[in-house]
Each structure stands twice: as C-alpha cells, then as structure tokens.
C-alpha cells in the first residue's frame, strides 16, 4: 500500500535501487517515477503462454505482465527477468530466452531450476528430473556462448568452488542479510521466522551492532567441513559450494550440518 511513497523516497535518496516485483501493479504514474529515479526492476516470467505462467503466478497474470513488459521496454527502463524452470515450462525455455533478451531487451535473464523445497514438497510432479536438470544445464552452457553474462543459471548446483580451505563460509552474514516486515535481521531468506537464527532487530539495535555480533561466526568460518555430517564424506566437497549453504537444510526441516535434500551426489 505504500509503494508510491517508497518510490518517491527512493528517488530522493539517490541510492541504486532494485525492486523485485511481479509488475502487475505498475501503472503510468509508477512507471514514470521508476524511470525518473533510474530504478531497476527484477520481474518473474515463468512461461510464454497463460497456461504455463499463470500456473505459477495466478489466473490472468500472463496477459497483464506481457502488456507491462512491452511498456517497460519502450520506456527504456532497466529490468531483468527471472524464470523458474519446471516441467510445465521446460519446453518453452528457448522461447523465453529469445523473448526476454532479444525482443524485450532485458539486461539479464536469470534461470532457476525448481527445487523440492517448501511448498514444492507437495508439488513434486512439476519438479525437474535429474535428466531434465542436466538438459537445462547443457542448454544454459550453449546459450551462454551466445549471450555471455546476460544469461545466468542462478541456482546453487551451477556453482563450483576452487577453494581448498575447509572453512564453511556462506554469503549469508558476509555479503548479504535478510530483513523481515518487522525489521528482524536474519542471515538470509531461509532463516526468516526461525528464532534460532534471528540476529537482532533494527528497531532496538543499530545495524552495525547487529553485524558485529558473534552470532554470525558460524557463517563466517567457525564451521569447518569436518563438522558437516554428510558433505565431509562426499568426493565432490572440494569443488561443490552447496555445502556452504547451511540454512537451506534447516528450512527443509533438517539439521544445520546436513546436506540439502536435492543433492544427488
């Protein structure tokens, strides 16, 4: 309800601002403010038909979104597209890539492979098989040769580590934090609402005080590979970075030192 006031404040602050949105509430006034403030947008596009996109985003979302995306493109507003790949839209990925990067002129296309986490544990019928995951990765490598840094496979299994250090260090608590609607501070979004990983509250404490708390140490190298119950015995632990993410297993109901459920190694 306060988006107009937020946009006004963002323009005044002269900060680099990126808003993640479904774009459905963008109107002419808000688009003008976004353009004036050089605000960047991150928008989800999960299919090239209403059948595939609306399956994830709700009935009627696709037609509204396409209309708004065309306006943003004409207004030369900077935006990126995020697509979550699942069984229903897998056959449209080539089309989504072409439409996003060529026709719309999106700065970047982020591809995420749907993982069996959260609500997806009850919707495993649309989660990609191991073979389909491999096919997506091959498609990504092929398209990356054409689009370079404009296309990014953003999920964790695409990442590799060349570190030989046994310390477990995550971006959470080092280069990012998550703040909920009550100004509670967490290491990342997977810790939100988990009291064990609440690092402080911005109403009661200064961010600098919260940031310097010893609570962060388990994300800053105090944990080592030997402390991990599953990953320490994996032959790929030297190159895999999924071991560094400790809150995804917690989010899944596992322990802090467990591996994530979709690791097949």
Language model: regions and residue ranges:
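A C-terminal junction/extension of Radical SAM enzymes
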Residues: 92, 114-194, 226-228, 233, ...
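Short clusters of hydrophobic/aromatic residues that line enzyme substrate/ligand-binding pockets
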Residues: 26, 53-56, 128, 151, ...
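Flexible mid-to-C-terminal extensions adjoining Fe-S/redox cofactors in radical SAM and related proteins
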Residues: 192-265
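Radical SAM/AdoMet-radical enzyme domain recognition
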Residues: 1-115
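Alpha-helix boundary recognition
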Residues: 11, 35, 70-73, 101, ...
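Glycine-rich, flexible loop/turn motifs
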Residues: 52, 110, 124, 166, ...
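A structural signal for well-ordered alpha-helical scaffolds and beta->alpha junctions
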Residues: 3, 49, 65, 93, ...
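Structured loop/turn residues at beta-strand edges in well-structured enzyme cores
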Residues: 36-37, 104, 172, 229, ...
